[in-house]
């Protein structure tokens, strides 16, 4: 379906092959094809392009998120002897009856915040816990590791 054929309404429009886990969508929102969104909020009148991967994030109203954007990528435990996920997914490997839940809770607590009326360009990456201020623009391919003030324009690696 072409974007010009979509008619938005109070009910969010979710394109095919999208996975939503513990996520709230506002009115007149559109979620692009093949997105994965987890532990997040997409407020009214905001949209995502195709192939976005968003975790642990709140997104304000009228936000424009281009294709292939990554927000809130989860980290590996670099303070441990190994970076491999067997150290916190020990149940998966048969090492324990349970996974390292405090590690997962700590990951989920690092909320990325995207303000109202923002534009996140194609292929941008926004790290966990970063705030993008209202009206800010994040250029295509930018890697954002620290907060962006309202109405700022950022490009490349900052």
Q: Could you say what each language-model-derived stretch is?
A:
Residues 148-158:
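Catalytic binding pocket for nucleotide-activated donors in carbohydrate/polymer assembly enzymes
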Residues 66, 139, 155:
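Alpha/beta-hydrolase-fold catalytic nucleophile elbow
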Residues 76, 142-143, 149:
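Flexible glycine-rich beta->alpha loop in the catalytic core of nucleotide-sugar glycosyltransferases
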Residues 2, 7-130, 158:
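Flexible, glycine/small-residue-enriched loop-and-beta-strand segment within the central core
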Residues 70-71, 143, 153:
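Conserved sequence/active-site signature of Rossmann-fold short-chain dehydrogenase/reductase
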Residues 133, 137-139, 143:
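A generic "structured core" feature
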Residues 119, 137, 153-154:
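Short-chain dehydrogenase/reductase
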Residues 58, 146-147:
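Conserved functional loop/turn residues at catalytic and ligand-binding sites
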């Amino acid at each position: 379906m072409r974007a010009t054929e979509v008619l938005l309404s109070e009910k969010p429009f979710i394109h095919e092959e999208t996975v939503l886990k513990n996520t709230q969508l506002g009115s007149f929102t559109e979620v692009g094809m093949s997105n994965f969104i987890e532990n997040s909020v997409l407020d009214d009148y905001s949209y995502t392009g195709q192939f976005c991967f968003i975790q642990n994030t709140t997104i304000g109203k009228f936000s424009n998120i281009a294709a292939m954007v990554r927000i809130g990528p989860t980290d590996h435990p670099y303070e441990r002897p190994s970076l491999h996920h067997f150290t916190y997914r020990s149940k998966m490997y048969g090492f324990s009856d349970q996974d390292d839940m405090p590690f997962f809770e700590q990951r989920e607590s690092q909320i990325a915040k995207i303000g109202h009326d923002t534009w996140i360009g194609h292929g941008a990456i926004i790290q966990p816990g970063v705030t993008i201020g209202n009206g800010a623009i994040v250029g295509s391919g930018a890697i954002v590791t620290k907060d962006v003030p309202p109405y700022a324009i950022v490009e490349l690696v900052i």
